[in-house]
Amino acid sequence: MQAQALDNVSKAAFSRREPRAVRTTLKVFPRKNWLDECMTELSPKTMHKRDLGCSGLYRISKVLITSASLEIKLANVINTLPALLPMRRGAIVVVGAEGEPETTATFGVEPPSSGARHIAAKAAIDRIVAKGAPLVVPDTCKSELFQDELQSIVSGTGQVTFIGVPMKADQETLGTLWIDRAKDGAATRTQFEEEVRFLSMVANLAARAVRLNGHESRDSRPIGEEGDRKISGGDKELPEPTRQRPTRIDWIVGESPALRQVVESVKVVAQTNSAVLLRGESGTGKEFFAKAIHELSPRRKKPFVKLNCAALSAGVLESELFGHEKGAFTGAISQRAGRFELADGGTLLLDEIGEISPAFQAKLLRVLQEGELERVGGTKTLKVDVRLICATNKDLETAVAEGEFRADLYYRINVVPLFLPPLRERNGDIPRLAKVFLDRFNRENNRNLEFTPAALEILSRCKFPGNVRELENCVRRTATLARSATIVPSDFSCQNDQCFSSMLGKTADRPLGSHSLNGLAMSKRLPVESPASLGYPAGPGGLTVAPHLSDRELLISAMEKAGWVQAKAARILGLTPRQVGYALRRHHIQVKKI
């Protein structure tokens, strides 16, 4: 074929070396070919610099970074283009779960008929998706690609020019952006080149938004299923299966009983507006489960907004959550909506909720109780409707007892607690997760690596104190350093005494039950009293090993030895007093008073 696909437009558009201009190339075709062929596939070549690229991309970017739903973003993109290009009609078409193009947002055209998935020019759209290359048809009347839709495309306006570009993310074509307009005999090749370049960059920005919203064609439902109707569909109802609520959490991998129990709880909890408190060690996937609750809830069409409370100071946190007025403080050059406003009607995830200061806890409590707030520096009261999900790996009960966390706020956020199991309590899921992470690495790096059964067995025996996050890092590190297409046991750092995490894992080498002694991250402490004084042999790292005892029995033994003083029992077990207190509550052990 004479031309090459315009694959790298998105990358070039945001090149650090050329921030204000995009250099692309177009293979020069003889003039007779341009007019006679009716269809021309374009490839990169140096194009003319024009303000259209800078100002236009800025406007499109502003549309895509809003907190609106994906359908609304795409609709706003297609409706912004007429102010930038001399277009008559246009549409964004995304490849659905079954591989069929589905019109998602339109401008200037009637919605597809009942049961139809596209507006017009299906053959042209199929060509763009299949080849991943732009398509320019100067006169649709002369192209066999448009014969079936010729009447609807021309519709009394005379000759029509068609321009379509692929929507690409990570070298995968996720859909098509196309426009058409009345043919302009004065249009030059340079003008076509500039418009193709600009549309390609817009399409790739839109594709990135599709990818980030989890609507890839290979593992998600069609975009139209996100709402009760398509953007361009007016009051036309979608087929019955589209209106059904999703019931699967496809991105949570695992079949262990501990995980499935949490998943089933998520499905039940998601149908309500109750506050949820996700608890578990770092790396257990609290954000994934929060997203699952949102996607399975009636609020799934509204925004899902998240904020890590531990990363911000109290002053900044207040501004981030509540917003601020112009001039409220130094640097507040404009009014800004807070996360509560952005999440209105949807779901707000507050990660590391246990790290917020007592002073700010009172302000947060008022918002949760009254459903209203004022921006920093403002006096106007704003009403918000937000479903709150909080996450923490902190022992909030001990924090309440010690006065570090308000009891009334604790009761407000702890309506439905969900405890996420650490990876070592579901090690049967490790091979599945490892394969998923390796497949992702292969796609990103164009590799074809695979594990041997022995390698998967090695992974299954690891403790992974960092849980799923650490497992992913382990897989990526091993895959990066692998010297052959097959990963064998000797490729793992832990087999060569080069893995620090394997040393941390030795501190958790005794048997652990569900939500056991380390409900939070296990960490080795220097014991004041010898673990052997409990009557058990010392295990790796100097910690006690009692294979015949359950965690509950081991905890009771330590407490009895310590005279039911939690701090002393913590030193015996190599834990913190907070972890011991957490374990006592999890195992429903009543502390005896001596």
From Swiss-Prot:
Residues 566-585 bind DNA. A divalent metal cation binds at residues 494, 499. Keywords: Activator, ATP-binding, DNA-binding, Metal-binding, Nitrogen fixation, Nucleotide-binding, Plasmid, Transcription, Transcription regulation, Two-component regulatory system. Residues 69-210 form the GAF domain. Interacts with sigma-54. Residues 213-243 are annotated as: Disordered. It comes from the Bacteria. One of its GO terms (biological process) is nitrogen fixation. GO terms for molecular function: ATP binding; ATP hydrolysis activity; DNA-binding transcription factor activity; metal ion binding; sequence-specific DNA binding. Residues 552-594 are annotated as: C-terminal DNA-binding domain. Residues 252-480 form the Sigma-54 factor interaction domain. This is Nif-specific regulatory protein. Signal peptide: none annotated. SUPFAM superfamilies: GAF domain-like (SSF55781), P-loop containing nucleoside triphosphate hydrolases (SSF52540). Residues 481-551 are annotated as: Inter-domain linker. The gene is nifA. ATP binds at residues 280-287, 343-352. Required for activation of most nif operons, which are directly involved in nitrogen fixation.
